[in-house]
A protein has these predicted regions:
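Extended repeat-based scaffolds of very large eukaryotic assembly and lipid-transport proteins
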Residues: 1-140
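Extended alpha-helical scaffolding segments
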Residues: 102, 107-185
Length: 185
């Protein structure tokens, strides 16, 4: 099996788990807002049954995917490098509470690896996609991008600059391009 096939399979496997964590996170935030308005900003809402159920559901759904990713990262650090799961997690759209921190730790790990050609190709696609939607982990993505720099990647980032984009996307693309051009010199 190719890494591309494994990556696609992992994306399909993780997507519903990630979506469940996102939905539970959204519900928890809604319960929090409702509780704050009901109790006038006091923290008594945390004792309500609805809030506790929502919190439990969020923790359970997040724990499932966090455990999969934690295990994959631990195994990768131990030398059993199957990066499909880690690549898939970084590629999934959206976020939930603390998912950005987990993604940042994955990117920190990836920047130290010597990658094969197929791994580099997949990671370049993820990096380009994350320019438009990453959260606080974008700094780590930029650092990892130096490891997979190529003329092709820089050209793809330049193309992003020529397309109509939101201002933050343009800023990120400029930042990424500056970093890659200074690294390649």
């Amino acid at each position: 099996m190719s890494l591309r096939h494994d990556f696609d399979r992992e994306c399909r496997r993780l997507a519903p788990l990630f979506a469940a964590a996102q939905n539970a996170d959204r519900d928890l935030h809604a319960a929090w807002k409702e509780g704050v308005s009901l109790f006038g900003g006091h923290h008594h809402y945390k004792q309500t049954e609805q809030y506790q159920k929502t919190l439990d559901r969020f923790n359970e759904s997040r724990q499932v995917i966090d455990q999969i990713i934690g295990t994959a990262l631990s195994e990768a650090k131990a030398g059993k490098v199957n990066l499909a799961t880690l690549f898939a997690y970084t590629a999934l759209p959206g976020r939930y509470y603390r998912s950005g921190y987990q993604r940042a730790s994955i990117w920190r790990f990836l920047k130290h690896l010597t990658l094969e050609a197929e791994q580099v190709q997949i990671l370049r696609g993820i990096v380009l996609d994350q320019i438009t939607r990453a959260g606080p982990e974008f700094v780590e993505i930029c650092r990892a991008a130096r490891n997979i720099d190529s003329a092709e990647l820089r050209e793809s980032v330049r193309k992003l600059l020529l397309q109509p984009q939101k201002p933050y996307v343009l800023d990120r693309a400029k930042r990424m391009l500056d970093l890659l051009e200074h690294t390649s010199v």
